[in-house]
Design a protein with these regions (language model features):
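Phosphate/pyrophosphate-binding loops at sites that engage ATP/ADP/AMP, CoA/4′-phosphopantetheine
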Residues: 12-26, 167-180
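An N-terminal assembly and electron-transfer interface module characteristic of large anaerobic redox
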Residues: 9, 95-103, 110, 213, ...
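Short glycine-rich, Thr/Ser-proximal phosphate-binding strand/loop in the N-terminal lobe
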Residues: 1-15, 88-95
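Conserved ATP-utilizing enzyme core subdomain
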Residues: 97, 104, 108, 113-146, ...
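Short glycine-rich phosphate-binding loop at a beta-alpha junction
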Residues: 22-32, 178-189, 207-210, 320-324, ...
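Adenine-nucleotide phosphate-binding core of ATP-dependent small-molecule kinases
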Residues: 140-169
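Conserved phosphate-binding catalytic cores of ATP/NTP-utilizing and phosphoryl-transfer enzymes
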Residues: 11-12, 35-72, 77-85, 175, ...
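Glycine-rich phosphate-binding loops at beta-strand->alpha-helix junctions
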Residues: 31-34, 162, 175-203, 214-215, ...
Length: 640
């Protein structure tokens, strides 16, 4: 559809009307990536997230299905089914390697069309072992296989096996085929490929059902959903445009930048012939309703408000700059109180923005760092342009000990990124940049270190007694700050329950509160009608418990504790935010998933970086809410 599905769909709808004069359409449901646009453009009745559409279709063909796998051209969806409801959803993340386009690309590179290439794979006598790595590595593996004299048949079969192994062991991360189930429906256009189908059956050790409309299962599921909804509502006629209206249909598209808030979203405004408009690209409802988002049940917004209250207080000793990034999203109250008590005016860098990120981009030494770390370069750049006596960003190996883990480290990036900044930011030359190694986990040692080692290097005339008083103020401010978060979290939970709303623990690190890092995902959740709390607002409700991994980081100990607590609350679910490039999260995601699944909860992971398109994020969130609704419906039916 070349990025615009409307002309194509209009053409097909007119064709249907012309071939079936007098046809009465009972209901129309849209699904897929263009769902909202198509629904609004043609006044369709319902919209359905594609994951649920595929699930609905699969259940029609096999009512007792326990596993569904859908491999399309660019994405992959897998569902584990228990007691007739979705118990787990797996979606591929940023990379589309191992999907249909992956096979098509290789077929074309080898001089075949994809159907011919697939057919050859069925006659392989010795499929090449190409592993299940990404396309870049696979390219070199295929070339090596050709050099070794492998036939096209064996290469085709090897690639089909790779697609299957990628799905099973990289996306789903199954330890064995048996754990997935025995009653399996496969769908998606990729399964029209007979070699992929056969490879899947051989790997799983069972025969599976592939409907002859495998590539249209989403559309079929949407139709079944529409049928059910119209029957429930006793509707016999759809609200969709008539033939005459379709013939007059026009669409004008304009791209504008929203000035409603600091997000400056790039909006796409579709205007239709009858004057209606459809706006996309917005992270909140303000461009549509003219009203700001309701943040009364959003703890992320509350935490942002708390941090905004820390303004500079004029002091006798000068000014200190603190970058509002990484660990300072939690420790700003501590360091603000410490330096203010010592007589310094504490200035923070501006709130993160796209412009601030781009301003510091030239000094980022490695693209493998997580986005929050990359942002810190922009914060340092901003501070360097302010008239400050010093910039303060200490190295902190340890975090506070909350008694939840085996140790209480900061991750290497949070702990030591000041070293990277000192070595790569030329704007710090000639500036007083304080990035000494400090530990706040031992109050007595902290006072001694600051009074005897750190402060004398940069400032004179500060006594140990003053440092002790400043430290006391800092610890008290930090405790008060964390207490406010826990109290507000409790208030939000109580109010959400009073209103009958779902509660989502949007769990990550303190710096995921940064709007430029989370891209407004908290608002996306509240727009779905749920309340948002954070992992640090509920982690104190759980005692230390055994984990499958070494539990040695403060932030991650909270994450595990929050996941554990969620399993005890019927109306609470956890969504984990993960920054691309985070090595530690390779461990935490599996552990968090395990904790939630053992407690009968769904696990949802959202990977985020500098890319602001939330289309895939919205699909995951809608899939979560739809799966939870499905569970409730199944439970209610059983209770009856």
């Amino acid at each position: 559809n070349l990025g615009n599905p409307l002309p194509l769909i209009r053409e097909q709808l007119l064709k249907i009307y012309k071939e079936h004069p007098g046809l009465q359409v009972a209901s129309v449901t849209t699904t897929g990536y263009g769902e909202d646009l198509v629904k609004n453009a043609f006044r369709c009745d319902y919209g359905l997230v594609e994951t649920v559409a595929h699930f609905t279709a699969a259940k029609y063909f096999m009512p007792d299905v326990d596993f569904i796998i859908d491999i399309g051209g660019q994405d992959m969806k897998c569902f584990k089914i228990e007691d007739g409801a979705i118990s787990n959803i797996f979606l591929n993340e940023a990379c589309s390697s191992g999907c249909g386009s992956f096979l098509q690309t290789f077929a074309q590179a080898l001089g075949y069309d994809v159907k011919q290439f697939a057919a050859l794979g069925l006659f392989a006598d010795r499929p090449v072992d190409l592993g299940s790595r990404c396309t870049v590595f696979m390219n070199s593996s295929v070339k090596q296989a050709q050099k070794d004299g492998a036939s096209i048949e064996n290469i085709s079969a090897g690639l089909s096996i790779s697609v299957v192994k990628n799905a099973l062991y990289k996306v789903i991360r199954a330890s064995s085929p048996e754990e997935l189930g025995r009653k399996i429906v496969v769908q998606g256009g990729t399964f029209y490929n007979e070699a992929v189908l056969r490879a899947f059956e051989k790997e799983m050790g069972v025969e599976v059902i592939r409907p002859d409309i495998a590539g249209l299962m989403g559309a079929y599921g949407a139709a079944l959903f529409g049928l059910r909804q119209s029957q429930k509502a006793h509707k016999t006629a759809s609200a969709m445009m008539s033939q005459k209206e379709l013939e007059k249909f026009e669409q004008k598209v304009v791209s504008v930048k929203c000035g409603g808030c600091g997000n400056h979203c790039q909006l796409t405004v579709n205007t239709f012939a009858d004057g209606r408009k459809y706006i996309s690209g917005n992270r909140c409802d303000k461009p549509v309703t003219g009203k700001s988002a309701d943040d009364s049940l959003n703890l992320y917004a509350y935490k942002q408000q708390l941090l905004a209250e820390y303004k500079p207080v004029a002091g006798k000793r000068g000014s200190i700059g603190i970058p509002l990034c990484l660990g300072f999203y939690e420790l700003l109250p501590f360091w603000w109180a410490f330096w203010t008590k010592l007589g310094f005016a504490v200035h923070t860098s501006p709130v993160s923005s796209r412009g601030l990120y781009l301003a510091g981009q030239a000094t980022i030494p490695s693209d493998t760092a997580c986005f929050p770390a990359k942002l810190s370069h922009g914060h340092i750049k901003a501070l360097s342009q302010m008239q400050l006596d010093a910039i303060f960003y200490p190295c902190l190996t340890y975090n506070v000990d909350e008694g939840l883990g085996d140790n209480h480290y900061n991750c290497p990036v949070v702990a030591y990124y000041p070293e990277v900044l000192a070595g790569n930011c030329p704007e710090l030359e000639g500036k007083k940049f304080i990035y000494d190694y400090v530990g706040i986990h031992r109050p007595k040692d902290f006072v001694h270190k600051m009074a005897k080692d750190v402060l004398p290097k940069y400032f004179g005339g500060i006594s140990e007694r003053e440092v002790q008083a400043a430290a006391d103020a800092a610890y008290a401010e930090y405790e008060a700050h964390m207490a406010k978060i826990r109290v507000k979290g409790s208030e939000i939970i109580d109010e959400a329950r009073r209103q009958g709303k779902r509660i989502i623990v949007l769990a990550g690190r303190p710096y995921h509160v940064d709007p430029e890092v989370n891209h407004g995902i908290d608002h996306l959740i509240t727009r779905h009608g749920a309340a948002v709390v954070t992992e640090d607002s509920i982690s104190n409700r759980v005692q230390k418990f055994p984990t499958s991994v070494l539990n040695q980081w403060t932030y991650h100990s909270r994450l595990y504790a929050a996941a554990k607590y969620c399993t005890t609350q019927k109306d609470m679910d956890l969504v984990q935010l993960v920054s691309f490039g985070c090595g530690v999260d390779a461990i935490t995601t599996d552990e968090t998933r395990e904790i939630l699944q053992e407690g009968g909860k769904l696990y949802t992971q959202l990977k985020i970086d500098e890319i602001t398109n939330l289309g895939a994020v919205n699909i995951r969130l809608r899939s979560l809410f739809a799966a939870l609704d499905e569970r409730d419906e199944v439970a209610a039916e059983k209770a009856e």
